């Protein structure tokens, strides 16, 4: 908990830089008429522009995030409680420091995060930058309001309530109880750093100065 609160504070005060781009490892593609990774493909170009979205191959997810910064990262693959095939395992969160603030994952089993050694929860406990972790695809998530300054908590509620407002080709498991956010619901993608170096003087008048955000 101490580590999470510290990196949350650092993100809000821009003590580390999160490059505005997205990373994708898509091991499913078209899966029985649905495409789980559409949650990344339709949001990341909107957030950052198509030139700031990178797709990596098998084994490239953690090795890339350990060395480069991405504001958002997505990975999907056949799952277990502690892994997503072609993406990584909980051990990768321990041995590496993934530099993605918002993490979106999809695969079997680990969406049930109330177990030990859980792949979805491991991200926010890592020494990397991850502050929010989402299990998406069943149903699809809608986080586009974050591009206009809304919080991830706002988008969590939007997704939880969504049935017909936003539609995908399939939207299996819409409005079910498992839709949840791992992390701080007040996080925003567009952080405004607090003003710094406040000073005041009082003579004939009171004069306040500060360094702007």
Predicted regions and their residues:
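Pro/Thr/Ser/Gly-rich low-complexity, intrinsically disordered linker/stalk tracts
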Residues: 188-213
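Cysteine-dependent hydrolase recognition
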Residues: 1-196
């Amino acid at each position: 908990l101490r580590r999470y609160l510290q990196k949350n504070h650092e993100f809000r005060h821009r003590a580390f830089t999160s490059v505005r781009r997205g990373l994708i490892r898509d091991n499913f593609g078209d899966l029985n008429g649905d495409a789980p990774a559409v949650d990344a493909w339709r949001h990341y170009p909107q957030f950052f522009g198509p030139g700031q979205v990178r797709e990596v191959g098998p084994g490239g997810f953690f090795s890339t995030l350990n060395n480069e910064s991405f504001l958002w990262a997505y990975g999907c693959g056949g799952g277990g409680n502690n892994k997503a095939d072609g993406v990584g395992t909980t051990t990768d969160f321990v041995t590496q420091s993934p530099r993605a603030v918002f993490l979106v994952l999809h695969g079997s089993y680990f969406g049930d995060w109330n177990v030990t050694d859980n792949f979805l929860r491991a991200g926010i406990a890592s020494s990397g930058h991850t502050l929010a972790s989402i299990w998406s695809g069943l149903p699809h998530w809608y986080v586009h309001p974050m591009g206009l300054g809304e919080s991830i908590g706002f988008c969590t509620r939007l997704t939880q309530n969504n049935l017909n407002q936003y539609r995908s080709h399939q939207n299996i498991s819409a409005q079910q109880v498992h839709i949840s956010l791992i992390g701080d619901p007040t996080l925003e993608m567009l952080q405004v750093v607090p003003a710094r170096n406040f000073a005041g003087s009082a003579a004939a008048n009171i004069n306040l100065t500060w360094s702007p955000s």
